[in-house]
A protein has these predicted regions:
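Active-site-proximal alpha-helix that buttresses catalytic centers in soluble enzyme cores
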Residues: 1-288
Length: 288
């Protein structure tokens, strides 16, 4: 005899999947294309797909231009052509965009975002652009994890929340000018609340900014400093973080990379753009 269908609040929710014909999610990857940036982007895309089965996730490189690393413009042009082919078969126009572009950036970088918008315009795809991933509490969690992995902060294995730190001052390193530093400062306040130590944001792409920030922290009483990159990774040249940390006389953690929250925030931005309601955890809201 068939099992009776559950009802009420204990009923198992219907599995979430991408709607048929939903726009492609195109991850805009900055920086010089490499096997490392491709691997990272593929892992982030995989996280997004695992949260939303059926998601058409693609990768476009802002500085790409060949089959191995296709440019953002080329990926969007192809998505638009595929949408047009579907419209011809269906005999009716698709009301939505061909793609939604999500920048793989923790914070704003106006010069890079201008290039992304230009690629979108050149493609003629009518694609939509989401916000960058931060500021967000989950990025503060990711920074905490990277610091703990480097031995620069103790990890609370139960909840990763409000614990003592091995460093008594944190420099949050970003790129993208004053706007990026201000945005990083918001996540920095969240990180400071978690670790109970001062956190100041500084620009990696401004000469001497990291060293000046280190001196500011030391002048306020901090001695054991740590540099935490508020960066996904591909947007900066190899060795830049290490060089800045050495100049400032402090240890450094790894970039955020393909931490799980990064993939969930990518999906959350996409879902908000196309009107898909995600479960709480997939929306990038910390679960307490």
């Amino acid at each position: 005899m068939p099992r009776a269908r559950q009802s009420g609040r204990h009923r198992r929710p219907e599995p979430l999947a991408a709607p048929e014909g939903a726009p492609a999610l195109v991850l805009a990857v900055p920086g010089t294309p490499s096997s490392a940036s491709r691997s990272l982007a593929e892992e982030v895309s995989s996280i997004a797909r695992s949260e939303l089965p059926g998601l058409d996730a693609r990768i476009g490189y802002v500085d790409g231009g060949d089959d191995e690393f296709p440019s953002l413009e080329a990926v969007l042009t192809r998505a638009a052509a595929e949408q047009k082919a579907r419209e011809d078969v269906d005999g009716r126009p698709d009301p939505g965009p061909a793609a939604v572009v999500v920048p793989l950036l923790a914070g704003p970088d106006s010069a890079l975002l201008r290039r992304i918008r230009q690629a979108m315009m050149n493609s003629g795809s009518g694609a939509e652009l989401t916000d960058v991933l931060g500021p967000h509490p989950l990025l503060a969690e990711a920074l905490h994890v990277r610091l703990s992995e480097a031995g620069l902060a103790r990890a609370d294995r139960a909840r990763l929340f409000t614990v003592a730190t091995a460093a008594d001052g944190i420099i949050l390193a970003t790129v993208g000018g004053d706007e990026a530093v201000q945005a990083a400062g918001i996540t920095g306040m969240l990180l400071s609340a978690r670790l109970a130590v001062p956190v100041l944001a500084a620009a990696l792409d401004e000469e001497g900014a990291i060293s000046r920030t280190a001196e500011q922290l030391r002048g306020s009483g901090s001695q054991a400093l740590a540099l935490a990159p508020y960066l996904i990774g591909p947007e900066i040249a190899d060795g830049l973080v290490g060089a800045a940390a050495a100049e400032a006389g402090c240890a450094s953690a790894e970039a955020l990379g393909a931490y799980g929250a990064v993939g969930r925030l990518v999906l959350s931005n996409y879902a908000a753009s196309v009107g898909i309601t995600l479960p709480t955890q997939a929306q990038g809201v910390p679960v307490r």
